[in-house]
Amino acid sequence: MSPVRPARGPSDILLVEDIRFYGHHGVTPAQQEVGAWFSVNVELALDLTPAALSDDLDAGVDYGQVVRRVVEVGTGERVHLIERLAGLLCEALLREHPAREVTVTVRKVTAPLDGVAAVPGVRMTRSR
């Protein structure tokens, strides 16, 4: 019996959600000084068949590496806009993983905005 394959090419998505870190990003000097909590969701579009068939981490993507890279980028260079942060994350993840496409959602969980539970964010998709 042959292995089950996705129809018309792989359409697999690897998810790592709600990666949290404290970053110093924002437009104002006060935002950069005080910092805020950020939450990031990552979606990597790649063929997961090798990992599904082998049950071998070397055939897939190590979620821990994804988390570490997101935290490293998020706590590294200070940027003004979460759009820039999302772009940096997309670049790093595409460079380091065999995904054909990556989508990141970045939310500034403790943004200094008026209103109840205002959580600004962006979703960015980039591909090879």
Enumerate the language-model features and the residues they cover.
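N-terminal, polar/charged subdomain of small-to-medium soluble alpha/beta proteins
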Residues: M1-R128
